[in-house]
Curated annotation (Swiss-Prot):
It comes from Schizosaccharomyces pombe (strain 972 / ATCC 24843) (Fission yeast). Has a role in sporulation. Its main location: cytoplasm. It comes from the Eukaryota. GO terms for biological process: exocytosis; sporulation resulting in formation of a cellular spore. This is Meiotically up-regulated gene 184 protein. SUPFAM superfamilies: Chaperone J-domain. Residues 85-122 have a biased composition (Polar residues). Pfam families: DnaJ. Residues 124-133, 176-187, 203-219 have a biased composition (Basic and acidic residues). The gene is mug184. Residues 134-146 have a biased composition (Basic residues).
Length: 551
């Protein structure tokens, strides 16, 4: 809001009209018409801008002085301001910023014009003849002697002076500057707790010994949760897409049933080996476009496997661990069996209830058609399938579950583990290739849902963090069991297909088995996709750990 012209004391309207302050209204009118005609913009061609400004000032002065009310207000305000500013202008020699003593500043203030409430209407007070020393310190800077920014400089402005020291007392005292180290020590010692004082007396840590930190407190790096799912997989993100290029190598050297599976597409090929790649096929299953949700339709298969992730931010993550090459080899145990084509899926002692169920020796497939001479059978012994990696993993999971923060489990976690153990079951079903009713029963993939990422708060961070890791460990065990048994089924089925290619077979009898090959190939492809989804889940989990410091 603009001020009214009669209250603007910064402009002398009498000087603009070139009149005395006691001029009458008629003189003001006559002088205005004369000057308006002289400074009219039409009378000043070539200098219109300057003429317009002068003409506007004349109009403003005539408006204020021709009105009796406005003129009275203007005369009162302008006269008061004129006397105050002209007669009582503070002396520039008595700059309060030059006084370095509290006594000098106080004594000087007694003679100032602001010491009396009627200073604006009384006469100019007598200046004291006493002179003070104006010595300035050698360490002063430019901004110390700057005048205050408020309009009227008072004698009490030493309050805002940075050099004024209220502890100096009466008289002139020299204030010496303390060393930086002593100043920091004195300032910090007044506010530090007792524990910090004790640590301080022991001696501060020298940050110069660690030039990489530059004297700053090093940030605590959150530990990354390493996957304990299975040795079948690599935690390196570069090996996520390599599972689709998996190849099976069959060794011809000694054991006709020994082969090696490597999940890495860049694995070195052994000598004297031939590759058996799974042929391409057109899948009949409908999959979703969502990369983290895979569900088979009820028309094709009753099983489903799904991953649901809440967090959509996926920053880059690089793991320092190298991919582990896993191998599955059929070996010959010492004990003989009545069936020469039975496979043992457990060789180590059971670790838990699920391990006991897995270690049951079940004939995977039997047939009376493939009769070979005794010379072709190596020592008439049964072929056992060694599963040392899985037992080692289960033992590690048991050790991990007995950690200090995992000793006690909630009722929800125990119920979750019990339900999943019962629903998981044995993935191995008998593959019957008998002459009467040949059939291949595909294993049903259980629904294993990873726990959703928790939303932490500062209050229940520790409680929810512990519950989440308990649930995640239960999921890791179930998923490891599923992956291991599925891989066993795939390897055994490939071995059967190899044997069927070697021995002549009457395909009229085994028509159903031939049709089951395509189903097995689809199962293998879906299993590879499940592996990839699981790796992406672990990648998201590591990113969330680094972001929120969940460990």
């Amino acid at each position: 809001m603009l001020a009214r012209p009669e209250t603007d004391t910064s402009v002398d309207y009498y000087a603009i009209l070139k009149l005395q302050k006691n001029a009458t209204f008629q003189q003001i009118r006559k002088q205005y018409l004369f000057l308006a005609l002289q400074y009219h913009p039409d009378r000043n061609p070539g200098d219109e801008e300057r003429a317009v400004k002068r003409f506007q000032r004349l109009q403003l002065a005539h408006e204020v002085l021709s009105d009796a009310t406005k003129r009275l207000i203007y005369d009162q305000l302008f006269g008061l301001s004129t006397r105050t500013r002209s007669q009582y202008k503070p002396n520039s020699t008595s700059n309060p910023s030059k006084h370095t003593s509290a006594y000098a500043s106080y004594n000087k203030g007694k003679n100032s014009k602001w010491s009396s409430p009627f200073a604006s209407t009384t006469k100019k007070p007598q200046e004291s003849s006493e002179k003070y020393s104006k010595k300035s310190s050698t360490r002063k800077k430019e901004h110390f002697n700057k005048k205050p920014s408020f309009p009227r400089d008072t004698e009490y402005s030493h309050i805002y002076n940075m050099k004024y020291d209220p502890r100096s007392g009466i008289g002139i005292r020299v204030k010496r500057q303390e060393p930086e180290s002593l100043k920091k020590e004195n300032n910090n010692s007044d506010y530090l707790p007792k524990s910090a004082m004790k640590q301080k007396k022991g001696g501060p840590k020298d940050s110069s010994k660690h030039p990489s930190n530059d004297g700053k407190i090093p940030e605590s790096k959150p530990s990354v949760y390493k996957s304990r799912a299975s040795n079948l997989f690599s935690s390196n993100e570069q090996s996520i897409h390599s599972s689709f290029g998996s190849k099976f190598h069959f060794d011809k050297s000694s054991n006709p049933f020994s082969f090696e599976f490597s999940p890495s597409s860049n694995a070195a090929k052994p000598s004297n080996s031939e590759e058996c790649n799974i042929p391409k096929f057109n899948s009949s299953f409908k999959t979703s476009n969502d990369f983290f949700t895979f569900t088979k339709t009820e028309e094709s298969s009753p099983y489903s496997f799904s991953f649901k992730l809440e967090d959509s931010n996926t920053p880059k993550f690089k793991s320092s661990s190298k991919p582990v090459k896993s191998s599955f080899v059929f070996t010959k145990p010492e004990a003989e069996s009545s069936n020469p084509f039975s496979f043992d899926f457990g060789s180590s002692g059971p670790k838990s209830r699920s391990d006991t169920r897995n270690n049951i020796r079940t004939p995977l497939w039997t047939s009376s058609v493939f009769e070979k001479p005794e010379s072709d059978l190596p020592n008439k012994t049964a072929f056992g399938f060694m599963r040392s990696n899985t037992s080692t993993f289960n033992q590690k999971c048991d050790d991990f579950s007995s950690a200090s923060f995992m000793k006690e489990k909630t009722e929800f976690e125990e119920q979750l583990q019990e339900d999943n153990d019962h629903s998981l079951g044995d993935l191995f079903s008998k593959i019957n290739i008998s002459t009467e009713s040949p059939s291949v029963a595909m294993p049903s993939i259980p629904v294993i849902q990873p726990p959703s990422f928790p939303i932490f708060s500062s209050i229940d961070f520790n409680v929810r963090n512990r519950e989440y890791w308990n649930q995640l460990m239960v999921f890791q065990k179930l998923y490891s069991k599923y992956c291991t048994e599925s891989q066993h089924f795939i390897n055994s089925w490939i071995n059967i297909k190899k044997e069927l290619h070697i021995v002549p077979v009457n395909w009229e009898i085994f028509e159903k088995v031939e049709k089951s090959w395509d189903q097995c190939e689809e199962f293998v492809a879906e299993f590879r996709q499940t592996e990839e989804k699981y790796f992406l889940f672990l990648k998201r989990l590591r990113e969330l750990i680094n972001k929120n410091q969940m460990l």
